């Protein structure tokens, strides 16, 4: 199967993939990713009446958001092992931590997705907002929600950066060329940037400068920083990689 993927449009043609054979680490990891999506499904109750059915449809968008985020994490995991094929103890440890965080992260992620979907659905008139089903949405509860989400996002991208750092430390053993070393360094920085945004949001939430809902609103809007940060970083690395390939 991996030999087929080597020719698929979308993979980096300038990187020699070393993980051409799927390992037991990846097989186990894929099972955990599948379990994470299964937990999302099991967290929803089976509708028994028409009212329950229409109510369950409110969870379609939150479910789609959660599945999309899990697939993004899975894809980055897949690309890492496809590039390097590492099976050493440190990589296994980091991979285990990643999977643990993912499973812990599933329920807070779905809760946040449902909560935001309810709010924005009401703002744009898509659904009639009913926040009562979330219990007391006090400032302290929203802070706890933002802290849980921030810790999960920060931990996941930090682990990815450490995994790429491990690959970089083993560059001689992996026989990485100059472009592959640059690509590995870029992946380290990209994941550090990805974990810096939830870290900033987490710090603002814990400091709580206003002591009211404005803090959690700001903490949430900070995640929009992903767009300009990753666009700028992508352009910088793209220019450097083109120069490197031309030399």
Curated annotation (Swiss-Prot):
Keywords: Cell membrane, Ion channel, Ion transport, Membrane, Potassium, Potassium channel, Potassium transport, Transmembrane, Transmembrane helix, Transport. It is found in: Cell membrane. Changing residue 38 to A: Decreased selectivity for potassium ion. A motif (RxxxFSD motif) lies at residues 24-30. It catalyses: K(+)(in) = K(+)(out). InterPro entries: TMEM175-like. The record marks 39 as: Hydrophobic filter residue 2. One of its GO terms (molecular function) is potassium ion leak channel activity. One of its GO terms (cellular component) is plasma membrane. Its main location: membrane. It comes from the Bacteria. Pfam families: TMEM175 (PF06736). The chain crosses the membrane at residues 23-44, 56-78, 89-117, 142-165, 187-210, 215-237. The record marks 42 as: Hydrophobic filter residue 3. Homotetramer. The six transmembrane regions are tightly packed within each subunit without undergoing domain swapping. Transmembranes TM1-TM3 are positioned on the inner circle of the channel tetramer and participate in inter-subunit interactions that are central to the assembly of the ion conduction pore. The RxxxFSD motif within transmembrane TM1 coordinates a network of specific inter- and intra-subunit interactions with other conserved residues on TM2 and TM3 and plays a key role in the tetrameric assembly of the channel. Belongs to the TMEM175 family. This is Potassium channel Ftrac_2467. It comes from Marivirga tractuosa (strain ATCC 23168 / DSM 4126 / NBRC 15989 / NCIMB 1408 / VKM B-1430 / H-43).
């Amino acid at each position: 199967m991996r030999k087929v993927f080597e020719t698929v449009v979308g993979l980096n043609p300038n990187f020699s993939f070393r993980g051409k054979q799927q390992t037991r680490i990846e097989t186990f990891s894929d099972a955990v990713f599948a379990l994470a999506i299964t937990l999302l499904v099991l967290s929803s109750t089976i509708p028994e009446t028409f009212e329950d059915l229409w109510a369950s449809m409110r969870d379609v968008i939150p479910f789609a958001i959660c599945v999309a985020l899990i697939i993004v994490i899975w894809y980055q995991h897949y690309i890492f092992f496809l590039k390097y094929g590492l099976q050493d103890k440190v990589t296994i440890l980091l991979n285990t931590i990643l999977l643990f965080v993912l499973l812990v992260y599933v329920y807070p992620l779905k809760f946040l997705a449902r909560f935001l979907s309810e709010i924005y659905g009401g703002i744009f008139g898509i659904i009639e907002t009913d926040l009562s089903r979330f219990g007391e949405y006090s400032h302290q509860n929203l802070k706890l929600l933002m802290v849980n989400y921030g810790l999960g996002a920060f931990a996941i991208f930090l682990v990815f950066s450490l995994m790429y750092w491990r690959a970089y430390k083993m560059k001689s053993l992996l026989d990485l060329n100059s472009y592959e070393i640059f690509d590995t360094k870029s992946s380290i920085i990209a994941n550090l940037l990805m974990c810096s945004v939830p870290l900033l949001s987490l710090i603002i939430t814990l400091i709580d400068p206003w002591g009211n809902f404005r803090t959690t609103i700001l903490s949430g809007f900070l995640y929009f920083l992903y767009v300009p940060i990753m666009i700028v970083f992508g352009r910088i690395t793209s220019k450097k990689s083109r120069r490197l390939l031309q030399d």
